[in-house]
């Protein structure tokens, strides 16, 4: 595939929203990295981040910043052409330091500067990388830029410039500028370091403060972890953590979540300890301690950092070949330096036909940038983009044209929409080609150690602690935060902790896991949430503002649940939509709301709606009525049952909200990506009047209000689910439960319970992030619609009183009409569904649909009665029921609560009678099929779908 002057080759990396390919210049045969971003998967925030990244990279040209070479936009993708870095990132470089001597690009470096046995990298290499990192940071600070995500994964490495002169490199990269691979500082015989990924970067003058939570936890400054405003010094903390990791081999602070990480930092009280056998010099240790000050006021500032002796002084301990003959940085005369012929320094790419050990270090940059720095003339040279040139391959048959430079056509960059604040924002994709087998083997080794089931010993305890630390580090490598509300951070941090816990994963084979993270170790693309064809095109559940709200997640993970309501393409959506829409022709109970059959978007909920499926265990039904059973259950099984019931209730509320949401957004991305709807999509774009699906402003306001309060209710139930799982996990950690009797039982029930809880947690995390994103969209839609109302309308912003904000959890800048509450909407819908189902039952119409309607109504009413209190185990049932009767929930008062309880009891009775009737009909049926008896009326076409398995 041709992209401008480049030919796209094999895929070498994949993220949630972009795919990275190896590319080659069609004429010079020099290599590039092509990052193809799928626009249909980007929400407003991601598009804004991408636009910001492109804007920043357009103006940055420095040898230690990865260059953006070109940019091409089509109707469906944006293709970013970037410099190709072949040695991967610094984290892999450190992790695989013991094998660097076997790699052809680094064997000479290891021969000259072997890694010390008590440390990570040789101090010569550490100082070399630090000098180059400082050079890039100084360039950024001169332009009031803060990167906000300095970490080893964003520091990419290229082969040393001298390796090209020796003929070691066979594949040559395309140069973003004349000096792209001429180091501004450091040694030409060592790998070249470049900063990558400017998705979080922003302009921040020295006197300004920011308050956006960005970066990766292990490298976050404590002021960011405390949700305080911060300045550019946050980057210096990250530099300190990176420097420590280069010296020691692991981050200075490791934890399973950001809360625990902050606790460890505070507990350390600025006492940075180094292993006794570590050979780092006192200068390096002093610099690390100065950078890792908790209080940013006490932390080393940028001028002092740039003037530190480690940065400015020559590197001690150089071999004779690397001793400088004359000062090279900075040149005495910039013009003379520019006119002096430079060595033909180049950075290459790993040859596809290389050895396995060579290929496993291969890496492709993510969103990146590039530029050249040669003081003192850098301000003049960096004002405009330099000429773009390629590198010539020595001894290659593909000789470049006689002119060594090739002008790059002016790059055109689309105008992106203005930024919109979101309650949560998706993390960036990690476009990395990691060695999955290596990573899996590392983690499996730890899991096998734990899963042997032998009694706990000191040696095993040490291994378990090491596994926990490794899990914490893996979690941190996977996590990025952008504009994340505190609750979202907690939800995603806990889900990551559980997914990476060796105690959860210990007894499970890798192939059987369904909730594990797979972003970095998996580059083959996201696994669809449902194997059915319509779902496969959707990917993640994020649709109309599609993207991973962190956390990333969107995680590139497999679905937490493989079993759905059925295997037909419509079964995943019809089970809930049938129940929600069979009740009445008046879809919302509002005269102006158009019925479902005439909406442009088709059926509702949307195609991407993935209902929560109860886990298929012997002790529970696939779809239950919420009735209590008297079977004695242990604590783990009780937790699983309560957690799954709470998640199911949240899913029913979510399905109701989706009906409203679908009316507001008739052309969701799930429909846009459907090939059958492309023609309609073009028509909609041409007709601006159809943007709101033909709804009046009043209808938009009402639908937005109803969707918003329902999403808030769903969020509260999802948060409670996380709290239940969190309380269970805390009890396990306090008692080290997986090593006690609970885990040592022969039947392994506790192991299964842990797996099921983890699966539910991963599902809840994805749904929580999705609801946050959609809730933010609905909130903005409501605010916009309210402004379009007549000035004398009660809902117009000018008529809002100060104290009239919604008390049910909506944002403080949103005011909804009096009487609009999630509980009332849910009660009315449940009552309507149950009444309609009762009528259909009496007339013998769609008995299977009646069962679904009854169950859905029960779940919805249970959600109305739901409180935010986490159940306490060991509490008697009688006490629980007494306490629950006294609780006043949101808009549900005590008297109203009794009405709801009686209605639930009545519906359960009708459901029990219906199931008896269905059982009798099933026995009379000539064949064991789930078809409705022929005497009944045909199914409503709106609600056609597979019946849930019993």
Curated annotation (Swiss-Prot):
Protein's GO biological process: autophagy of mitochondrion; cellular response to nitrogen starvation; cellular response to potassium ion starvation; piecemeal microautophagy of the nucleus; protein localization to phagophore assembly site; protein transport; regulation of autophagy; reticulophagy
Basic and acidic residues composition bias: residue spans: 549-565
This protein's UniProt keywords: ATP-binding, Autophagy, Cytoplasm, Kinase, Membrane, Nucleotide-binding, Protein transport, Serine/threonine-protein kinase, Transferase, Transport
Principal subcellular localisation of the protein: cytoplasm
Enzyme class: transferase
Stored SMART domains: S_TKc
Record's bilayer topology term: Peripheral membrane protein
GO cellular-component term (any): autophagosome membrane
The UniProt record lists the keyword ATP-binding: yes
Protein's UniProt keywords contain Transferase: yes
Binding residue positions for ATP: 12-20, 35
EC number(s) stated in the UniProt entry for this protein: 2.7.11.1
One of the record's GO molecular function terms: ATP binding
Location within or outside the cell: Cytoplasm; Preautophagosomal structure membrane
Catalytic activity entry: L-seryl-[protein] + ATP = O-phospho-L-seryl-[protein] + ADP + H(+); L-threonyl-[protein] + ATP = O-phospho-L-threonyl-[protein] + ADP + H(+)
Region (Disordered): 314-425, 443-467, 505-570, 671-690, 926-950
Family: Belongs to the protein kinase superfamily. Ser/Thr protein kinase family. APG1/unc-51/ULK1 subfamily.
Functional description taken from the UniProt entry: Serine/threonine protein kinase involved in the cytoplasm to vacuole transport (Cvt) and found to be essential in autophagy, where it is required for the formation of autophagosomes. Involved in the clearance of protein aggregates which cannot be efficiently cleared by the proteasome. Required for selective autophagic degradation of the nucleus (nucleophagy) as well as for mitophagy which contributes to regulate mitochondrial quantity and quality by eliminating the mitochondria to a basal level to fulfill cellular energy requirements and preventing excess ROS production.
Subunit structure: Homodimer. Forms a ternary complex with ATG13 and ATG17.
Identification of the protein by name: Serine/threonine-protein kinase atg1
């Amino acid at each position: 595939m041709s992209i401008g002057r480049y030919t796209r080759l094999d895929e070498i990396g994949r993220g949630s929203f972009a795919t990275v390919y190896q590319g080659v210049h069609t004429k010079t045969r020099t290599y590039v990295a092509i990052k193809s971003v799928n626009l249909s998967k980007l929400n407003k925030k991601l598009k804004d981040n991408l636009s910001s990244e492109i804007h920043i990279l357009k103006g940055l040209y420095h040898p230690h910043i990865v260059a953006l070479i070109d940019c091409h936009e089509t109707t469906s993708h944006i293709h970013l052409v970037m410099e190709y870095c072949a040695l991967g990132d610094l984290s892999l470089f450190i992790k695989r330091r013991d094998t660097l001597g076997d790699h052809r690009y680094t064997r000479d470096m290891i021969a000259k500067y072997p890694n010390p046995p008590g440390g990570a990298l040789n101090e010569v290499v550490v100082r070399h990388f630090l000098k180059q990192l400082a050079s890039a940071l100084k360039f950024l600070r001169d332009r009031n830029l803060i990167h906000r995500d300095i970490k080893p994964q964003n520091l990419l490495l290229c082969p040393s410039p001298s390796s090209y002169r020796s003929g070691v490199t066979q594949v040559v990269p395309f140069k973003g500028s004349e000096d792209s691979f001429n180091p501004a500082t450091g040694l030409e015989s060592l790998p070249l370091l470049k900063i990558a990924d400017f998705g979080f970067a922003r302009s921040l003058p020295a006197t300004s403060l920011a308050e956006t939570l960005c970066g990766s936890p292990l490298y976050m400054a404590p002021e960011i972890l405390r949700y305080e405003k911060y300045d550019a010094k946050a980057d210096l903390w990250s530099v300190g953590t990176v420097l420590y990791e280069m010296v020691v081999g692991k981050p200075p602070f490791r934890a399973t979540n950001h809360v625990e990480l902050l606790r460890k930092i505070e507990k350390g009280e600025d006492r940075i300890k180094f292993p006794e056998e570590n050979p780092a010099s006192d200068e390096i240790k002093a610099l690390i301690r100065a950078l890792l000050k908790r209080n940013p006021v006490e932390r080393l500032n940028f001028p002092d950092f740039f003037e530190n002796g480690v940065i400015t002084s020559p590197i001690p301990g150089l071999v004779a070949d690397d001793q400088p003959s004359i000062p090279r940085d900075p040149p005495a005369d910039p013009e003379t330096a520019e006119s002096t012929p430079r060595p033909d320094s180049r950075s290459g790419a790993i040859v596809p036909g290389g050895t396995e050990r060579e290929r496993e270090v291969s890496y492709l940059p993510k969103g990146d940038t590039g530029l050249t720095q040669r003081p003192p003339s850098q301000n003049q040279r960096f004002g405009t983009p330099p000429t773009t040139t390629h590198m010539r391959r020595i001894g290659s048959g593909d000789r470049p044209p006689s002119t060594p430079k090739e002008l790059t056509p002016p790059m055109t960059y689309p105008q992106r929409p203005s930024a919109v604040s979101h309650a949560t924002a998706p993390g960036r994709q990690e476009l990395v080609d990691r060695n999955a087998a290596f990573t899996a083997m590392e983690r499996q080794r730890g899991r096998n150690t734990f899963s042997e089931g032998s009694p706990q010993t000191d040696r095993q305890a040490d291994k378990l602690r090491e596994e926990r630390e490794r899990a914490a580090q893996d979690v941190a490598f996977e996590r990025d935060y952008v504009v994340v509300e505190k609750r979202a951070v907690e939800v995603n941090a806990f889900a990551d902790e559980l997914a990476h816990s060796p105690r959860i994963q210990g007894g499970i084979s890798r192939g059987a896991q369904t909730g594990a993270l797979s972003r970095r170790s998996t580059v083959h693309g996201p696994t669809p949430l449902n194997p059915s064809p319509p779902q496969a095109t959707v990917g993640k559940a994020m649709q109309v503002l599609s993207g991973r709200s962190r956390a990333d997640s969107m995680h590139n993970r497999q679905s937490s649940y493989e079993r759905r309501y059925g295997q037909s393409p419509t079964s995943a959506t019809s089970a809930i939509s049938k129940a929600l829409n069979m009740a009445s022709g008046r879809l919302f109970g509002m005269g102006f709301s158009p019925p479902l059959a005439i909406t442009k978007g088709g059926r509702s909920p949307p195609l991407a709606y993935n209902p929560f499926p109860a886990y298929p265990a012997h002790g529970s039904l696939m779809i239950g009525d919420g009735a209590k059973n008297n079977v004695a259950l242990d604590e783990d099984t009780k937790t699983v049952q309560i957690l799954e019931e709470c998640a199911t209730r949240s899913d029913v509320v979510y399905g109701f909200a989706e009906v409203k949401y679908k009316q507001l957004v008739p052309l969701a991305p799930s429909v846009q990506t459907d090939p059958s709807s492309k023609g309609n999509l073009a028509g909609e774009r041409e007709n601006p009047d159809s943007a709101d699906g033909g709804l009046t402003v009043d209808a938009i306001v009402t639908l937005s209000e109803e969707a918003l309060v329902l999403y808030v209710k769903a969020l509260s139930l999802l948060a409670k689910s996380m709290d239940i799982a969190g309380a269970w996990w805390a009890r396990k950690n306090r008692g080290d439960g997986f090593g006690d009797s609970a885990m040592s039982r022969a039947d392994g029930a506790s192991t299964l319970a842990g797996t099921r809880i983890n699966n539910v947690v991963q599902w809840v995390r994805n749904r929580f992030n999705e609801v946050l994103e959609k809730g933010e969209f609905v909130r903005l839609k409501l605010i916009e619609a309210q402004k379009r109302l007549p000035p004398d309308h009660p809902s117009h912003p000018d008529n809002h009183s100060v104290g009239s904000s919604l008390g049910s959890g909506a944002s403080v800048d949103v005011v909804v009409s009096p009487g609009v509450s999630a509980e009332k909407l849910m009660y009315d819908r449940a009552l309507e569904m149950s009444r309609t189902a009762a009528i259909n039952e009496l007339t013998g119409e769609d008995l299977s649909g009646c069962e679904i309607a009854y169950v859905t109504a029960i779940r919805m009413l249970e959600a109305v009665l739901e409180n935010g209190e986490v159940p306490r185990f060991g509490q008697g049932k009688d006490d629980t029921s007494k306490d629950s009767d006294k609780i006043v929930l949101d808009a549900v008062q005590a008297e109203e609560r009794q009405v709801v309880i009686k209605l639930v009891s009545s519906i359960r009775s009708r459901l029990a009678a219906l199931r008896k009737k269905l059982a009798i009909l099933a026995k009379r049926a000539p064949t064991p099929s789930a078809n409705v008896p022929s005497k009944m009326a045909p199914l409503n076409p709106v609600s056609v779908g597979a019946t849930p398995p019993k």
